[in-house]
Amino acid sequence: MADLEEQLSDEEKVRIAAKFIIHAPPGEFNEVFNDVRLLLNNDNLLREGAAHAFAQYNLDQFTPVKIEGYEDQVLITEHGDLGNGKFLDPKNRICFKFDHLRKEATDPRPYEAENAIESWRSSVETALRAYVKEHYPNGVCTVYGKKIDGQQTIIACIESHQFQAKNFWNGRWRSEWKFTVTPSITQVVGILKIQVHYYEDGNVQLVSHKDIQDSLTVSNEAQTAKEFIKIVEAAENEYQTAISENYQTMSDTTFKALRRQLPVTRTKIDWNKILSYKIGKEMQNA
């Protein structure tokens, strides 16, 4: 081990540490960071060399953050990244500094975003917040209005998590939806992501995603927002149901097909206990 450490350059050590951090399961960033810190044994090198990994993790995970003085949380995403550690809260029309390691927001200041699309953005956000409140008790959403390639574009992000360290599991749901405000008909593009880590008496991870495309009729702001939410709800319900059904099937068939009649320990295994993981069901109720 000592010989291996001598062969690794600081750059290689940081690269390995950054990979561990970026792939940390939801809710376990601090645990992974502390383990990597012990392995690297060089705080300055870790902070300077892996700073990009801290940022990438928060962007990828849609990390929610509470800004002092404001009621609603906002998501840390690439769509709100203003550069130099600053992020946009489109609902409250402010920007703020975000510490990717401490996950803290500071220095909120007024910020004017794309005013030309604000009425559309606001209508979609109002409808999406109602949807999230109904389906995701711990959910947070942020809606952006941006001009992309000359087109007025709405981007809606949803995050919901349950961190149950005492019960040995953590999970996070993320979805991102995008459409351009164009006359008559537009294309809605979405991606749904679910990630769960269960680590009692074993180590099981669920990492799944699904791409969505659908057509949206564009009329006025309120009606378009309503139709958009119908698409979101149908797609997310279908995906969550499919996840649950797949785990039921795996419990009934796949896992049982892998077993011995009697394991090496000569003790029969309760394969139905695998179903008790209830990963899909737990996230569906998240």
From Swiss-Prot:
This is F-actin-capping protein subunit alpha-2. PROSITE patterns: F_ACTIN_CAPPING_A_1, F_ACTIN_CAPPING_A_2. GO terms for biological process: actin cytoskeleton organization; barbed-end actin filament capping. The keyword Phosphoprotein applies. InterPro entries: CapZ_alpha (IPR002189), CapZ_alpha/beta (IPR037282), CapZ_alpha/beta_2 (IPR042276), CapZ_alpha_1 (IPR042489), F-actin_cap_asu_CS (IPR017865). The modification Phosphoserine is found at residue 9. F-actin-capping proteins bind in a Ca(2+)-independent manner to the fast growing ends of actin filaments (barbed end) thereby blocking the exchange of subunits at these ends. Unlike other capping proteins (such as gelsolin and severin), these proteins do not sever actin filaments. Belongs to the F-actin-capping protein alpha subunit family. Component of the F-actin capping complex, composed of a heterodimer of an alpha and a beta subunit. Component of the WASH complex, composed of F-actin-capping protein subunit alpha (CAPZA1, CAPZA2 or CAPZA3), F-actin-capping protein subunit beta (CAPZB), WASHC1, WASHC2, WASHC3, WASHC4 and WASHC5. Interacts with RCSD1/CAPZIP. It comes from Oryctolagus cuniculus. GO terms for molecular function: actin filament binding.
